Each structure stands twice: as structure tokens, then as C-alpha cells.
Amino acid sequence: YSGCGAEWSPGNSNIWPHQSSLDEEYVTNDIGVNGDNIIVSTYAVNPELAGGGECWTDVIRPMGVYAHEFGHILGLPDLYDKNSANGDSEGLGEWCLMASGSWLGFAGDVPAHMSSWCKLQLGWVEPVVIDQNISSANIGTFATTGSVLKVWEDDYYWNRYFLIENRQKTGFDSNLNGEGLMIYHIDENQNYGLNEMSGGFV
């Protein structure tokens, strides 16, 4: 949409960038490439310009918010803390596009990569499964190789595991505050939690 978004300044009357779905599909009178009417169901809205209370009329919105919202269209949840009832947390923080990594660089002009969990959900990475004792393992830089190790948690085969990635300051990860091994503990039995902004589960 034209103008700025509320992600810069939540108290203003601008629209929040978001992804959602209509309760009922909307069938347009427009014909698509397949010859059928175009149907609108899932959508995303993003601002044209950067700025909060005052729009920066000469600054096109950096790509971080667009990339984050497109992640939702692909089916990914927000991975930042939306409910501090159990204590404040940054979720995955700047280490993932689906958390605050969408804001890296100048207000999101160089957003971080998605975490290995996100890329695994989308089928974009194939982890190397470590299912026996080893003394060492090589793991390439995640941003350039997509390398990720998967280690099952003892007695929880198929639903609890660790993902290990090597994050270095290169490419879209060049604005991370640090670098090294990221180890995620995944429990597939847990739901994604309540998304307070959309009022439902994500």
C-alpha cells in the first residue's frame, strides 16, 4: 500500500504489515492465466515507504518486512516473543528472518537468513542426521552452504531434536551481532503459540 507502515511507530494510524486469510474466498470478475476467475484468499500487505510518524517520502521500504511477511505466506510463524506472561524473551532474535532478523542492516535492507528450522519446514534444507557417536563433524557456513546438523534428543526420536548451524557474518547474515554455532532445541509436540496480533494460533 502507499505510504508508511505502523511497524515503525505503533501509535500512529498507519496500517500494520501483516499476512492473513479471508474467512471466505473472494472471487473476482478478473480472469487468470488458467481462464478461471481469480480467487483471493490468503494475502499480505506491506508499506511502500519507510518512516514512522513522519513518512520518509524519498526512502522506499527496505525488504526485511516484505521478506518476513512472505515467510508467513509460505506458512511460517512469527518466531519472536508475542506474550511476555512467562517472562520477556526475544524469541530467535536477530538470528532469524521470522524474528527480529528482518530488521538487520538499515531498518531491514539486509535481513538475516531464515533459521534452519524455517528452511527445514519449507523443504529448503536437508539436514545431516547424526544418529551415532562421533568425535567431530564439519559444518559449512549456513548462509552459503545451507549446511545443518540434526541430532535426536535421547528417548525422543522423531519429535525432539537439536538443529546445529554455523552462522557467519556473510551475505544476508553480514549484520549479525556475532557469529558461531547456533544450536536450536526443537520440540515438535509444542504448538507455535498464540499470535496476539492476529488473535489466533499461527
Segment roles from a protein language model:
Residues 2-176, 184-189:
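Extracellular hydrolytic enzyme modules, especially secreted metalloproteases
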Residues 186-202:
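Extended, compositionally biased non-globular segments
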